[in-house]
Amino acid sequence: MKIMKHCSQTFPTTATGSIVGMDVGGTLEITNSFPFPVVEVPPESHFDNAAANPAAAAPRAKANTVYQAEMIRMLREVNVDANNVGWYTSANMGNFVNMNVIENQFFYQKEMNERTVALVHDVSRSSQGSLSLRAFRLSPRFMTAFKENKFTSEELQKSGLRYQDIFVELPVEIHNSHLITSFIHQLQTPNIPAPTDLPPSLAALESGPFVKSSILAPNYDNLTLSIDPFLEKNCDLLLDSIETHHTETNNFQYYQRSLAREQQRISAWQQKRKQENATRAALKQPLLPEDEWQRLFKLPQEPSRLESMLNSRQVDQYARQIDSFVSSTTGKMFAVKGNLLPGETAK
């Protein structure tokens, strides 16, 4: 509840905080949390390429390390589980796959404990009626590649690292505390109303009090074909991510063309130098060095493929969300297929 309240209050800006608990028999039990204070990073600071939103970089900020240790010490004094088991962040429309989340989780798994997790609470999706709370860890293969900063095409082909291997999602189960469970059992149940007589006709059923008061009554509004605004926004974000993917692809293709041009120039220079050395050898003159091209030519540096991997993972995230939301609209479209397409009958 603390996590959901904090994320909802700061929405749509990013909210981050620390989670504490215990590791019991291989199960990570989260029992408490507290938010991180937002540290204003000065403009001249270059700490980890600090993001425009200071809250997104708060979990790995040096100023919050002391704050986190002090909070855990005070929790321990009041006999609360005070083992740091990870951190949490808010998300909007599932857009949590970014460099800030990667760097924060890498910091926790490297500096604190490899079993720490990142809890992601999607405020927008939770507002649709179902709680969205997911837990992630960075995979060991991605941790190794990120530590060595090896995200070139050659290294990715050698290691077989794909965008699906960035995160390892863990199952999440939510339980009430024993005090809340005991309180719920003590609540009085409402009195069961006496059974009512069945309506004699359809007209009596439609005009009766049951239709006006119950949400289970037949309602033609449920057949409306209006598109959910949440689904529409997800489609827009998916298109933006696809455009970003095309931009990254064009940048990499530009690098490949530049590399091919430089390699052709180097090959032509080496061929010319070999001919010159052959002529000088025939004249018994000293040969010229053939490795001088390394000083004369500079090969373009291959751009990192990390951003492309993260964007591909974000596209996959949006696609999964859209797939989970189109089921209701698709069912309605098939229900009225016979009326939309004249000449066809439903089979």
Curated annotation (Swiss-Prot):
Pfam families: eIF3h_C, JAB. One of its GO terms (molecular function) is metallopeptidase activity. GO terms for biological process: formation of cytoplasmic translation initiation complex. PROSITE patterns: MPN (PS50249). GO terms for cellular component: eukaryotic 43S preinitiation complex; eukaryotic 48S preinitiation complex; eukaryotic translation initiation factor 3 complex. InterPro entries: eIF3h (IPR027524), eIF3h_C (IPR045810), JAMM/MPN+_dom (IPR000555), JAMM_MPN+_peptidase_M67A (IPR050242), MPN (IPR037518). Disulfide bonds: none annotated. It is found in: Cytoplasm. Its main location: cytoplasm. Residues 1-142 form the MPN domain. Signal peptide: none annotated. Component of the eukaryotic translation initiation factor 3 (eIF-3) complex. Belongs to the eIF-3 subunit H family. HAMAP family: eIF3h. Component of the eukaryotic translation initiation factor 3 (eIF-3) complex, which is involved in protein synthesis of a specialized repertoire of mRNAs and, together with other initiation factors, stimulates binding of mRNA and methionyl-tRNAi to the 40S ribosome. The eIF-3 complex specifically targets and initiates translation of a subset of mRNAs involved in cell proliferation. This is Eukaryotic translation initiation factor 3 subunit H.
